[in-house]
Amino acid sequence: MTVTQTLQTWTVAETIIGIAGLAFTLLLGLLVGCASRKPDANELSARGWVDVTATLDPGTTPVYEGDAPMKFEFLKNMRTGDNFTLSVYSMGAHSGTHIDAPQHFIRTGGSVDQIPLEALTGTARVIDIADGVQAIDAAELNRHDWKGAKRVLFRTRSSLRSWMASPEFHRDFAYLAPDGAQLLADAGVALVGFDYLSAEQFGAPAPRTHQILLGRGIPIVEGLDLRPLQAGDYDLIVLPIKVRGHEGAPARAIARRTSASR
């Protein structure tokens, strides 16, 4: 090999190394940028589980009018000199995100510990209800793509206004009208969820919505925080505290986009 050929070989090699180094630098920068950027709620809902449980806090969590007030206190507290911390929670069974079991309005209905796990876990459809809609009746329901859904979650004005993160109780929350409840029950849904403290109209003369759903054995999840979600299908897990013989209990709820929706 001549000197000229040797120099040409070195030049080609240096060029290849330079290009490879530049590509590595760009890739590293991209990875670092992706790792340091915090994903927004929509990305989280597309990539993994999202907590749709309202945080329990006496200072920020609303309580249904007339229900037991929420009170948390420390019996022992390491911050005040004790050698361990011990808390007591006092609140109603229907505080924050919670489950209504059939026993809530049906005398012979099952208690919260008897709700089948199959009803509480599986695919759910989030329905976006416009801010101006308060009564979700059969006509309103049929304006949305809900048919075929096994579980239906309503994202209403309560999510748009962050009412589950505000201590003030609002009477004008959106609710499911009895004919809407009948439509869902007749379609065989396994669970219905709401983003405020009740699925029933405040001050309704009779609890027909609860009676229709719970009478069919359909549990109701109330007090969900659906702000991070958009309309669409999700995998849903709702697990209430296992309290024997009672009509309801606080629950933890998580959701993620179904693989078909990602």
Predicted regions and their residues:
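N-terminal secretory signal peptides that target proteins for export/translocation
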Residues: 1-13
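Active-/binding-site microenvironments in catalytic and ligand-binding cores
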Residues: 12-14, 18, 29-262
